[in-house]
Amino acid sequence: KATEQIKFCSPISGKVKAVMRGERRRILRVEVESDGKMQRVQLVKAGFQPATREEALQLLLNSGLFAFFRQRPYDVVACPIDMPKAVFVSTFSKMPLAADFSFIVKGQEADFKSGIALLEKLAKVYVGISPEQINTPILPLDSAQVSVFSGPNPAGNVGVHINRVSPVNKGEIVWTVGPEVVVMMGRLLRQGMVDFT
């Protein structure tokens, strides 16, 4: 509520059915009743490439994808007014039963790469990968510094990557975003509309 530019977009088209609030009127859940049409809004023309940081930021805000960005320290929703020192993306998790990102991104590697290029418009981009991902189609990434992390959990934790690669000093902030959101950002550039599938 402090930053009105951030939009939270529904993955389906329809009407808001209910808004569930918790303590201090915090929004816990918004229920949307589908109209069965799955209409999407064309935000930009397909193949759009933002030229400036402002264009890239405005596209992410209008699409609702900026709501997925987290700010460190404190792990809160990022503020678009702030200038981060860097953006971090961890492409793996060592937690038990964690999904394999290489499987998730299969066939969407080009979207992942163009999403990383979009992030590069915002700040320096650091991508953490596991040794198993070195010879996969997600590499090379020309727009990011790639670091390899191995070992047990929490090796895939983005906080570990921040601490090892570019620690946050007093007065600095960094943004983090999940790799599945980076794929959605690349898909947004390719199609010109948000696709949460």
Segments from the language model and where they lie:
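Buried, small/hydrophobic-residue-enriched core segments of structured protein domains
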Residues: 6, 20-197
